[in-house]
């Protein structure tokens, strides 16, 4: 009876050992153990393997949760996040300080230019940063320590006056171009008014000279001619008049001729 019992034990132990080896568990075979049924031993091995199989990953998970590396990583992340916050606050402070400085300098320049020309400053409405020539270099590069680069600060706002002069020239040209047609129309209207007024004056003067001055001048010329004839006459007539005073076409001469005719007739009748 001893030999078959040993064979049965060896078969059961070998099968259980192979089954357990599939799950990575080894077991030594002891020949002195009591005989156990195959079904009961398989159930025991399954229970053992289940407990061992599920016990190991739980331990591994608990170890992973308690490892110091994850805590160190979380602390590092917190520190980097805080450092980023501090750097951002520094950058914002420096940028705002630089903006305040730029606006203060712009105000001083504007105060000087307002005393020179107030009208130009009223018309100009520039943007705060683009007018001063602060391009992307104005937002200077910030180092890891939070300091500003002096090169970008020096060369950022060096040409505000030139830009201001150019803008004022452009404004003046636009105004002149808008006023050109108005000025031309006003000049044309003035010339027409002057021509009309002078034309009326010229017409009045011409008519007055033709109707009033010319006859007066003619009468004066005839009087002068009569005086000259009297002075140049050689003798007097019968009635004490100069021969040069006779005017055949005059009314006095005609009356004289008629009277003389009547006298001659009366003299003949009386004879």
Swiss-Prot record:
The keyword Calcium does not apply. InterPro entries: At5g23160-like. It is a single-pass membrane protein. Keywords: Membrane, Transmembrane, Transmembrane helix. It is found in: Membrane. Changing residue 228 to K: In strain: cv. Bla-10, cv. Bl-0, cv. Can-0, cv. Cvi-0, cv. Ka-0, cv. Kas-1, cv. Lip-0, cv. No-0, cv. Pa-1, cv. Per-1, cv. Sei-0 and cv. Sorbo. Disulfide bonds: none annotated. GO terms for cellular component: membrane. Its main location: membrane. Changing residue 41 to V: In strain: cv. Can-0. PANTHER family: OS07G0553800 PROTEIN (PTHR34379), PROTEIN, PUTATIVE-RELATED (PTHR34379:SF3). This is Uncharacterized protein At5g23160. It comes from Arabidopsis thaliana (Mouse-ear cress).
């Amino acid at each position: 009876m001893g030999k078959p019992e040993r064979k049965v034990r060896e078969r059961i132990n070998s099968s259980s050992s192979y089954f357990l080896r599939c799950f990575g568990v080894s077991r030594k075979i002891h020949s002195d153990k009591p005989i156990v049924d195959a079904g009961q031993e398989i159930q025991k091995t399954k229970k053992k393997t289940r407990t061992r199989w599920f016990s190991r990953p739980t331990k591994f998970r608990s170890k992973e949760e308690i490892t110091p590396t994850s805590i160190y990583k979380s602390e590092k992340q917190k520190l980097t996040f805080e450092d980023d916050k501090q750097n951002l606050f520094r950058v914002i402070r420096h940028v705002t300080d630089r903006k305040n400085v730029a606006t203060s300098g712009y105000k001083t320049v504007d105060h000087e230019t307002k005393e020179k020309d107030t009208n130009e400053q009223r018309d100009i409405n520039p943007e705060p940063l683009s007018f001063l020539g602060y391009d992307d270099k104005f937002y200077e590069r910030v180092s890891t320590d939070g300091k500003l680069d002096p090169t970008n600060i020096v060369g950022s706002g060096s040409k505000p006056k030139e830009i201001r002069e150019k803008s004022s020239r452009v404004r003046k040209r636009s105004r002149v171009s808008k006023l050109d047609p108005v000025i031309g129309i006003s000049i044309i209207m003035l010339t027409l008014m002057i021509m009309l007024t002078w034309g009326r004056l010229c017409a009045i003067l011409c008519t007055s000279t033709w109707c009033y001055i010319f006859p007066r001048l003619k009468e004066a010329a005839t009087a002068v001619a009569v005086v000259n004839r009297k002075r140049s006459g050689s003798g007097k007539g019968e009635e004490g008049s100069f021969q040069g005073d006779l005017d055949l076409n005059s009314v006095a001469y005609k009356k004289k001729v008629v009277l003389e005719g009547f006298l001659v007739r009366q003299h003949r009748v009386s004879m």
